[in-house]
From Swiss-Prot:
UniProt superkingdom: Eukaryota
Keyword hit for Calcium: no
Protein name: Orcokinin peptides type A
Keywords: Cleavage on pair of basic residues, Neuropeptide, Secreted, Signal
Record InterPro entries: ORCKA/B (IPR040384)
GO terms (BP aspect): neuropeptide signaling pathway
Main location: secreted
Keyword Hydrolase part of the UniProt annotation: no
Similarity comment: family membership: Belongs to the orcokinin family.
Gene Ontology cellular component list: extracellular region
Function: Myotropic peptides that enhance both the frequency and amplitude of spontaneous hindgut contractions.
Species assigned in the record: Procambarus clarkii (Red swamp crayfish)
Gene Ontology MF, one: neuropeptide hormone activity
């Protein structure tokens, strides 16, 4: 009995000691007043000027903005795009607005678009809606359907359509029965040639005379030259209603 009472007394003593003990809790952590270094005071994330690549083969670098919804593309200011998926390469100081397959490019830029066999350089503007082509300033092109007219200080090599053009309006387009020669008059197939940009395209019934005059009735094409016909306007006007082509003003 004595041992049992001793055991009970010992247990009671231990319980009392445990109850009397002080349980210390960890002090509450005061919130830091230091701002996150990765965010500005307004809470917006810091804009980082680094390169990145997306799943559509797009590479973008430095001080630019991209808005790309679906296949639409908008790019602004001081950036570089390499869009190999669509065969597009664009560099330096330009703006692209590409909605669907429409294309608009302006000012001091270079385009190499091998997918459509197009190469264009320097000081020009391209507006390409659907497959139509419109280019202005220093060699204007208006290509509606498959009609094509290009002038001065540029080079086009468009092998996809069998077209090769070099240096001040020389054309050799054998794929479509087109041949251009200089200083060789020919009277075959209703053809007559004089000086500066002669075209002999007998396959399509083409007649061109003197400083880029074209009279092509077979395809609804009529062009008149300086002081030759009363309906002539300003050194190289083309009115090609059959293909919806109109070009005016001095080159």
């Amino acid at each position: 009995m004595t041992a049992q009472m001793f055991t009970i007394a010992l247990l009671l003593s231990l319980s009392a000691i445990a109850a009397a003990g002080t349980i210390k809790t960890a002090p509450a952590r005061t919130p830091s007043t230091q701002d996150d270094a990765s965010f500005p005071p307004d809470g917006a994330p810091v804009k980082r000027f680094d390169a990145f690549t997306t799943g559509f083969g797009h590479s973008k670098r430095n001080f630019d903005e991209i808005d790309r919804s679906g296949f639409g593309f908008a790019k602004k200011n001081f950036d570089e795009i390499d869009r190999s998926g669509f065969g597009f390469n664009k560099r330096n100081f330009d703006e692209i607005d590409r909605s669907g397959f429409g294309f608009n490019k302006r000012n001091f830029d270079e385009i190499d678009r091998s997918g459509f066999g197009f190469n264009k350089r320097n000081f020009d503007e391209i507006d390409r809606s659907g497959f139509g082509f419109n280019k202005r300033n220093f060699d204007e092109i208006d290509r509606s359907g498959f009609g094509f007219n290009k002038r001065n200080f540029d080079e086009i090599d468009r092998s996809g359509f069998g077209f090769n053009k070099r240096n001040f309006d020389e054309i050799d387009r054998s794929g479509f029965g087109f041949v251009k020669r200089v200083y060789v008059p020919r009277y075959i197939a209703n053809l007559y040639k004089r000086n500066f940009d002669e075209i002999d395209r007998s396959g399509f019934g083409f007649n061109k005379r003197n400083f880029d005059e074209i009279d092509r009735t077979g395809f609804g094409f009529h062009k008149r030259d300086y002081d030759v016909f009363p309906d002539k306007r300003n050194f190289d006007e083309i009115d090609r209603s059959g293909f919806g082509f109109v070009r005016r003003n001095v080159e």
